């Protein structure tokens, strides 16, 4: 089983890496250009992330209201998750961490996370050897997704909201403080280290879900493929699903934030690489406008290209 999973990871990395382009630069030129461009786009990564919220305040308001509604119903939905999902999805992916990393405490190199991190490392290493510029950009953007997701969730959002994690099971005192049965238990502060602190005040949003969706979005946009990145992300997420210990809204917010992070990274990278986003070009958008007047009563359909 362990050998099969390792072979599967190699095949996934190979499938993603297989999209090549004509070689125009030597290895060192390609490597240097990718690193320089990716470093220079860091400010724009966050500019694009900010635009995700500021470009359409009405939509942002709808999302905020929806999240508030999820928080209000968290006790019901989280209890249902604990009662019906966690007991019925019970598996653990085998450990694939190499022996020389046995002493590492980096959460992205151990456990289930390794199934996402190692293929990215393999993709980037293979792209370096093959002088594949696109593969190198994808690898760097994926590493950015991990770094940004970790910093935004652990340093910024969790420090701001400081929400405590739910008891497991809810309505008990099985774990005790800082786990809680109160879904409005916010602003509790943080203790010890900020990046990987103890459980107090670390519920909203889920760092793992944020990172999983950020990585999946980067790969989906770069390779125009939903099945491989989101399929792998789903398998990894449900491995040891009990261990996540989050309210439902924590995971939903993580998925939204992660998607925005991944999309912002790729759009910023595409702009620097001269790749135009033509995904909406040629699509017909229809707007339906009711019209009532003395001359006409009906539905006006306006098409935009």
Per-range role (PLM):
Residues 28, 68-78:
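Alpha-helical transmembrane segments of multi-pass membrane proteins
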Residues 1-2:
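N-terminal secretory signal peptides that target proteins for export/translocation
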Residues 64-69, 131-139:
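Membrane-interface helix-boundary motifs at transmembrane edges
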Residues 68, 124-125, 155, 237-238:
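Alpha-helical transmembrane segments of multipass membrane proteins
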Residues 76-90:
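Interfacial/capping segments of alpha-helical transmembrane domains
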Residues 72-73, 126-132:
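Structural signal for the C-terminal ends of transmembrane alpha-helices
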């Amino acid at each position: 089983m362990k050998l099969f999973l390792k072979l599967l990871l190699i095949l996934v990395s190979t499938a993603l890496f297989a999209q090549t382009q004509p070689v125009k630069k030597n290895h060192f030129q390609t490597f240097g250009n990718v690193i320089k461009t990716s470093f220079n786009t860091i400010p724009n990564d966050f500019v694009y992330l900010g635009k995700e919220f500021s470009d359409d305040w009405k939509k942002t308001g709808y999302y905020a209201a929806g999240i508030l509604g999820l928080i209000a119903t968290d006790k019901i939905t989280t209890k249902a998750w604990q009662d019906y999902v966690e007991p019925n999805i019970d598996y653990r992916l085998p450990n694939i961490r190499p022996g020389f990393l046995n002493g590492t405490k980096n959460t992205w190199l151990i456990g289930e996370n390794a199934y996402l991190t190692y293929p990215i490392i393999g993709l980037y290493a293979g792209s370096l050897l093959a002088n594949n510029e696109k593969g190198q950009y994808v690898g760097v953007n994926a590493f950015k997704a991990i770094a940004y997701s970790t910093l935004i969730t652990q340093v910024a959002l969790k420090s701001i909201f400081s929400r405590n994690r739910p008891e497991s099971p809810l309505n008990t005192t099985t774990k005790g403080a800082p786990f809680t049965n109160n879904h409005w238990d916010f602003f509790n502060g943080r203790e010890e280290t900020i990046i990987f602190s103890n459980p107090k005040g670390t519920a909203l949003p889920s760092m793992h879900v944020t990172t999983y969706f950020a990585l999946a979005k980067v790969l989906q946009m770069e390779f125009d493929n939903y099945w491989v990145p989101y399929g792998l992300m789903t398998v990894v997420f449900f491995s040891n699903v009990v261990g996540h210990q989050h309210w439902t809204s924590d995971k939903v917010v993580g998925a939204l934030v992660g998607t925005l992070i991944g999309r912002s990274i790729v759009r910023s990278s595409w702009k620097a690489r001269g790749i135009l986003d033509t995904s909406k070009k040629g699509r017909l958008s229809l707007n339906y406008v009711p019209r009532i007047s003395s001359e006409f009563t009906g539905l006006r359909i306006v098409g935009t290209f």
